[in-house]
Design a protein with these regions (language model features):
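Bacterial N-terminal signal peptides that target proteins for export
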Residues: 1-9
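Bacterial N-terminal signal peptides
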Residues: 8-19
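Histidine-acidic residue clusters that define the catalytic metal-binding segment
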Residues: 25-31, 163-202, 236-239, 269-273, ...
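Extracytoplasmic
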Residues: 25-27, 34-37, 47-53, 65-69, ...
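M16/MPP (pitrilysin/insulinase) zinc-metallopeptidase core fold and M16-derived inactive scaffolds
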Residues: 53-111, 171-175, 290-305, 315
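Acidic/histidine-enriched segments that form metal/cofactor-coordinating
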Residues: 90-192, 342, 354-376
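An aromatic/glycine/proline-enriched structural segment found at the starts
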Residues: 168, 199, 203-271
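C-terminal regions of mature proteins
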Residues: 203-209, 347, 351, 355-427
Length: 427
């Protein structure tokens, strides 16, 4: 996923049948996907390696009883796959990653390694076969990873609290992974695997030094026995805050080094006529409103000594904005919150100039193109849209979408951000 903002997508049947250009390469849907949700090949002649990405179309948002169970399941599936094919687990699950909406397993090699890569990929869908002691010991590894992240970013806890207040929940779009660490069990992970790690909830992206014919042959060889079933539905897409919510919670804690507020706001972009265009417009719009608030509260103002922002979008037009603010000495958290709310309210789209839009557009086009220089970024972009079933896209292709994003849609998103909508703050 792109680190600047995270973009969340689900299926749209129209574009699953369309070929997408990737520089000189083509994103080709494989004709026979067998039981898989979808499969693509991306021939890249300039590369000597082959990358196979298995995208499980479920992640932490799909947890409904135990936060962190998707992460623990990822560990077991990755290590079991390694043990089955390589006869021993690799040192860690370095080839796997759990996000909010998906779990991605990546295996890389050259053409001589293709059968081994396919076996590793196929084995992820098999129920993890590891000793009971090994499976239980991996819970301690997950705990250490979570605690390490918490120590390095104490504000993660505050950000989780504000999302729990916004959605009135501890699961789905909100989570509580630290509190639930002692709830992790082998049985819960196997249950999660049995429900979500099915072919029809999985997508494969094969890229690099390979052609369509060979990719189809290998897909049939290793997944030809799979049967199509229903995909696991994303129930979190229906999880929204209460209309008119303005939750204000004051706490006292010694877990943070400085006084800090965490703010979350939920709003919507209702025009879903162009799903791909919506993401590009959002990329620019969020850059503009982030810049305005950063100028008012941090660069030009006397409110924040530290200010960070993030925005997320879902395919149904739901948008989530979060901000963390550490005020200057002498500025109370209550005053900082008032300044933040007033800065959002006063962001008038009539004052946003064509030049400002084009600067934001050019900046994001350049940023996205720069990611094309990194092989890792290419893989991230391939899986980005694929995280919920859409065809892969490259950094350069996404930069074209940004360049063509309509000004009208950009301003509509900013207007929706400014308008009154459900929010929560922790002071």
């Amino acid at each position: 996923m792109i680190q600047k903002i995270k973009i969340i997508f689900v299926l749209t049947s129209l574009i699953l049948t369309l070929p997408f250009c990737l520089n000189a390469q083509e994103v080709i849907p494989l004709k026979n996907t067998h039981g898989l949700y979808n499969a693509y090949v991306i021939p890249i002649r300039e590369q000597s390696r082959i990358d196979i990405q298995l995208v499980i179309l479920s992640g932490s948002y799909d947890e409904n009883e135990i936060s962190g169970i998707a992460h623990y399941t990822e560990h077991l599936a990755a290590l079991s796959s390694d043990a089955a094919v390589l006869q021993e687990p690799r040192q860690r699950d370095l080839n796997a990653f759990t996000s909010q909406v998906s779990t991605v397993y990546t295996n890389t090699g050259n053409q001589d390694d293709l059968d081994r890569l396919m076996r590793l990929t196929r084995a992820v869908l098999d129920t993890p076969q590891l000793s009971e002691d090994f499976k239980k010991s991996e819970i301690d590894i997950v705990k250490r990873e979570v605690y390490y992240k918490e120590r390095n970013a104490p504000s993660r806890w505050l950000n989780r609290l504000v999302l729990q207040k916004l959605y009135n929940s501890k699961y789905g779009r909100a989570e509580t992974p630290v509190a639930d660490l002692n709830k992790l069990t082998v049985k819960a992970a196997i249950d999660f695997h049995n429900k979500h790690y099915i072919p029809s909830n999985s997508m494969i992206i094969i890229s690099g030094n390979i052609n369509e014919s060979l990719a189809q042959k290998k897909l049939t060889e290793y997944f030809g026995d799979t049967k199509k079933t229903k995909r696991v539905m994303d129930s979190w897409l229906n999880q929204r805050p209460e209309n008119g919510l303005e939750s204000i919670t004051k706490i006292s804690t010694n877990r943070l080094l400085s006084n800090q507020l965490s703010f979350a706001k939920f709003f919507r972009f209702d025009d879903l006529s162009d799903i791909l265009g919506m993401q590009a417009s959002f990329f620019i719009a969020s850059d503009i409103y982030n810049s305005h608030l950063n100028n008012l509260l941090y660069l030009d103002g006397n409110t924040a000594q530290s200010f960070s922002q993030s925005s997320y979008i879902a395919i149904n037009g739901d948008i989530e904005y979060t901000a963390s603010l550490i005020p200057f000495d002498g500025v109370t958290l209550e005053d900082a919150y008032k300044s933040l709310r007033m800065s959002i309210k006063n962001l008038d789209t009539n004052n946003i100039t064509q030049k400002e839009i084009e600067i934001a557009r050019s900046k994001n086009v350049a940023y996205t193109k720069s990611l094309a220089q990194s092989p890792r970024a290419y893989l991230d972009f391939f899986q980005n849209l694929g995280s919920d079933g859409l065809p892969p896209v490259s950094p350069k292709e996404f930069s074209k979408m940004i360049a063509n994003a309509p000004n009208e849609d950009i301003l509509k998103i900013i207007s929706a951000f400014v308008a009154d909508s459900p929010s929560a703050v922790i002071l």
